Structure formats: structure tokens, C-alpha cells
Amino acid sequence: MAIANKNIIFVAGLGGIGLDTSREIVKSGPKNLVILDRIDNPTAIAELKAINPKVTVTFYPYDVTVPVAETTKLLKTIFAQLKTVDLLINGAGILDDHQIERTIAVNFTGTVNTTTAIMEFWDKRKGGPGGVVANICSVTGFNAIYQVPVYSASKAAALSFTNSLARLAPITGVTAYSINPGITRTPLVHKFNSWLDVEPRVGELLLEHPTQTTLECAQNFVKAIEANKNGAIWQLDLGQLIAVEWTKHWDSHI
């Protein structure tokens, strides 16, 4: 998918990886970039507008933990203005295994609910045009950081959901792929809580090993968007973009 002249909704587009990705997206010249985020950062929005004045950058406050009906109402407003939306990026995430319910609500349920809400406008069974979903998951969905099992499990769930979305594309007209960053130097990673405090220094320990910058991650994110491969499981790690081949251990045969 060429980003130029497209309409994009980016959930959590002002976070660590999110903001750098938003910068790279506007450089590529979409028609509209609509950012939905809990963070109200007028300075960042102004910066994005200045990077490419031809791009219309809009911000709406949004918490992914709200009910689907509230998300649908917000999307109705956005679709009324834009008429069409080409890409939804679900990027909300927290890393704090002390907050069990909220971790699951933000990292998994929020992704499911936002995607479910946009299907009202995209699903070809309802006369919709289809669309593309890019879900930010994590390499911990492949192999857990066992000291943060709640976070890791929430990302594995988001990855599984995304894989299923891709398989449903012939029915819904909506394609999907996952973005799975490795350890990226963001405020999220510097200090966070392990489950039951099993490892108080887990953030420090991770940063003792090779990492990537948010810019490296963002640049590869844009490459993944442009590749637009339904069902792709993209690993964005150490400045590299790698298509992961998923090993099938079981099949439902339906």
C-alpha cells in the first residue's frame, strides 16, 4: 500500500514508537492522518503538521478500554468527515505486570474492540469497501519475557487475533498483519514492573542487550505498511524487518 493520498487512523500514534512512526508516515504523504490517543500533545500534533503541511493531521482523545459502542460513535464521526479510511493502526500498549486487568484491557481487548468497531464501516458483508488493519503486537508474542507473563500473554493474544483476522479476509474484505517490535529504547522499557516482583530489574537487564531505536522501528514499520501483505507477521528488531514464518502445530480443518 502506497501511503501517499491514503486516509489512516493511528491509535496511540503519539507514544514512543507511535510518534516516530507518525513522523515517518506524514513524510510519505497520506491525505489524512487521524491520531486517536489518551495523550493530548498539541506540540507533537503541530510538529507532525509542520513536517508535511499537505497532510491533514487530526487528533481525537481516545481510550481503547471504552465499550465498542463508544468507539463506533467516534469512528462514525471520522468516517463522516473522511468518507473512506484505508488503514487502521492499533498501537495502544502498556507494560506493567502489576496492572493485570488493565494490561489485558489495553493490549488485547482494546485492539479487538477497536477492530470490531471499524468492521461496521468496512465489512463487505454490510456493503463496506474493506480495509487494512495493522496491529502492533510484540516479539514477546513469539517467546515470552517470562518475568512479565501478563504482558507477554496479552501480546500473544493480540497476535493470534491478528492472524485470524487475516484468514477471515475473504469473508470480510478486511486484511490484517502484525507489527512485532523487539526491545526498543522507549520510556516503556526503561523501568517497569514484573509480575509479583519476580525480577525488580527486568527493564535494566533487557537494556544490557542489543536494542533498537524508535526511529529504526518506525522506518521499518512504514516499509511493512507499504508491503501490505495480508497475514504477514513482521518482526521489527535491531533495525531489521523480517517476515516470520509461523509454524503450524495443529489445524482445526475447517
From Swiss-Prot:
The entry's active site is: 151
Looking up PANTHER family in the UniProt record yields: 15-HYDROXYPROSTAGLANDIN DEHYDROGENASE [NAD(+)], ALCOHOL DEHYDROGENASE-RELATED
Identification of the protein by name: Alcohol dehydrogenase
GO terms (molecular function) for this protein are: alcohol dehydrogenase (NAD+) activity
GO CC list: cytoplasm
Which interval of the chain is the signal sequence? none
The protein's Enzyme Commission number: 1.1.1.1
Q: Where are the transmembrane segments?
A: none
Q: How does it assemble?
A: Homodimer.
The alphabetized UniProt keywords are: NAD, Oxidoreductase
State where NAD(+) binds.
10-33
Q: Which InterPro entries match?
A: ADH_Drosophila-type, NAD(P)-bd_dom_sf, Sc_DH/Rdtase_CS, SDR_fam
Which PROSITE patterns has this protein been placed in? ADH_SHORT
**Gene name tied to this protein:** Adh1
Q: Which reaction equations make up its catalytic activity?
A: a primary alcohol + NAD(+) = an aldehyde + NADH + H(+); a secondary alcohol + NAD(+) = a ketone + NADH + H(+)
EC primary class: oxidoreductase
Similarity-based family? Belongs to the short-chain dehydrogenases/reductases (SDR) family.
Which GO biological process annotations does it have? alcohol metabolic process
**Origin species:** Drosophila lacicola (Fruit fly)
Residues that bind substrate, according to the entry? 138
Output the Pfam families linked to this UniProt entry: adh_short
